[in-house]
């Protein structure tokens, strides 16, 4: 029997991503909430949730748009992981059928908890061929286990980048004969350039992985940590080949039989049009919004193209696309970004989402959708909001500039395109000249302090060397006395 929640294309639906690093309480998207939920006594609204995994219904309370009482129990029972995509389809009045899609956008199987998983943040990174989500108590059939599945969705994480290793889920490796093999494997980018890595198999945890070049491949091709990228197994012989692709996965390769469901396509397309990131200090200081090349390519964003930033109140901020230098360079928006941030009152650590909209005959738009105060793990910053490396670079550069050019530094700063006064709101806070002078003074003082500390260390080392010379002289005198005695 077909899943009633996903067989009808007219059903209203939305999807959320379980946030990383905490017990997440997802929020219903604002547009969906205002259209279909708001006004139904939402202060005491309860949602009824069903799934394929269990023959029962859960009640989940809403606190505004956020899931509250009952959600933690539902997510625990269904073994939801960090960064899982969860699709909600309405099948009745305030009743939703829930499909957990793992870290890909197709449905996954619930695998028994005692099955080894070598790496938690790489566990659900493959398109599943299963027809339905099955219960933990229902074993997979031989047909399900042996079915071919050529698509892999890799979740790039800080951990697999630092280890230079990507683990392959067992179902994908087994169905394509990649388990229990040790050989070379090629990763190809969309331009046809290949990187040779090693395919390895661990008997300890029955896990296949690729290593020895994964970090370099991600760096050169602009694959960012926290993002998902699709690969297709296009060659499987003595030397397998995985090709990076940005196009939508064909429906027939993701599902079997006569099912006419385009869940993976629709979810993937929606995900490709949304840009979710955490607001960090450098975004405001640089005056730039950086766009990854995969996001730009998927949405056909081109260099020098005009784009309008639309804030939460509908205000427009004209901008344009520029490109960084070098292979794997990124696109970025500069003009209007600071004013856009001020209009939406973005603060450090907040997660926000932008939707890319391209209409026929109109300028493309990046619309502000929502933001959350739930902070995710960030790189440590100093009191000025910069990393230690950025601070050291800034100290050296500003000290040199202030010594060489003096007051002309302020005139240059006022001529930067990122500080265009037309893009700043009248009430936007700014640094006064006295504040800038004080900052430069403090930088110089800090630099001098560092120089004095280095000089002090050199003096101490010099004293140690002088003491060593005296010891050597004394030793030489003793040697001379011994020689005289021997003669």
Swiss-Prot record:
Residues 379-431 are annotated as: Disordered. Pfam families: B3 (PF02362). InterPro entries: B3_DNA-bd, DNA-bd_pseudobarrel_sf, REM_fam. Its main location: nucleus. SMART domains: B3. CDD domains: B3_DNA. This is B3 domain-containing protein REM2.
């Amino acid at each position: 029997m077909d899943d009633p929640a996903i067989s009808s294309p007219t059903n209203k639906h939305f999807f959320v991503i379980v946030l990383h690093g905490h017990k997440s309480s997802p929020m219903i998207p604002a547009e969906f909430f205002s259209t279909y939920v708001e006004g139904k006594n939402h202060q005491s609204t309860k949602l009824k949730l069903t799934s394929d995994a269990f023959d029962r219904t859960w009640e989940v309370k809403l606190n505004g748009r956020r899931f509250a009482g009952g959600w933690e129990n539902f997510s625990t029972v269904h073994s939801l992981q960090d960064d899982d995509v969860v699709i909600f389809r309405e099948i009745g009045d305030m009743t939703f059928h829930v499909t957990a899609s793992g870290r890909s956008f197709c449905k996954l199987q619930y695998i028994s908890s005692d099955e080894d998983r070598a790496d938690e943040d790489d566990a659900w990174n493959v398109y599943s061929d299963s027809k339905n989500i099955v219960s933990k108590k229902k074993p997979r059939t031989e047909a399900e286990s042996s079915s071919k599945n050529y698509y892999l969705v890799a979740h790039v994480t800080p951990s697999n980048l630092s280890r230079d290793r990507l683990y392959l889920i067992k179902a994908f490796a087994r169905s394509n004969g990649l388990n229990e093999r040790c050989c070379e494997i090629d990763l190809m980018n969309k331009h046809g350039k290949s990187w040779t890595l090693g395919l390895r198999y661990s008997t300890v945890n029955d896990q296949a992985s690729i290593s020895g070049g994964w970090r370099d491949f991600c760096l050169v091709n602009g694959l960012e940590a926290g993002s998902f990228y699709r690969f297709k197994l296009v060659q499987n012989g003595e030397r397998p080949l995985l090709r990076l692709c940005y196009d939508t996965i064909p429906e027939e390769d993701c599902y079997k039989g006569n099912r006419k469901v385009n869940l993976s396509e629709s979810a993937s397309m929606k995900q490709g049009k949304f840009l979710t990131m955490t607001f960090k200090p450098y975004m405001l200081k640089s005056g730039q919004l950086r766009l990854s090349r995969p996001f730009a390519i998927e949405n056909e964003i081109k260099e020098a193209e005009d784009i309008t930033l639309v804030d939460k109140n509908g205000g427009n901020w004209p901008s344009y696309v520029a490109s960084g230098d070098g292979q794997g360079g990124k696109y970025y928006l500069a003009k209007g970004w600071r004013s856009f941030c001020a209009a939406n009152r973005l603060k450090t650590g907040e997660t926000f989402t932008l939707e890319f909209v391209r209409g026929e005959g109109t300028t493309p738009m990046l619309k502000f959708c929502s933001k959350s105060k739930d902070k995710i793990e960030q790189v440590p910053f100093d009191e000025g909001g910069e990393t230690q490396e950025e601070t050291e670079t800034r100290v050296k550069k500003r000290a040199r500039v202030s010594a060489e050019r003096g007051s002309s530094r302020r005139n240059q700063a006022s001529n930067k395109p990122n500080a265009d006064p037309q893009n700043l709101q009248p009430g936007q806070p700014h640094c006064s000249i006295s504040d800038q002078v004080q900052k430069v003074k403090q930088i110089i003082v800090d630099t001098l302090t560092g120089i004095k500390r280095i000089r002090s260390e050199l003096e101490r080392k010099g004293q140690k060397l002088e003491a060593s010379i005296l010891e050597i002289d004394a030793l030489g005198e003793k040697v001379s006395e011994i020689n005289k005695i021997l003669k």
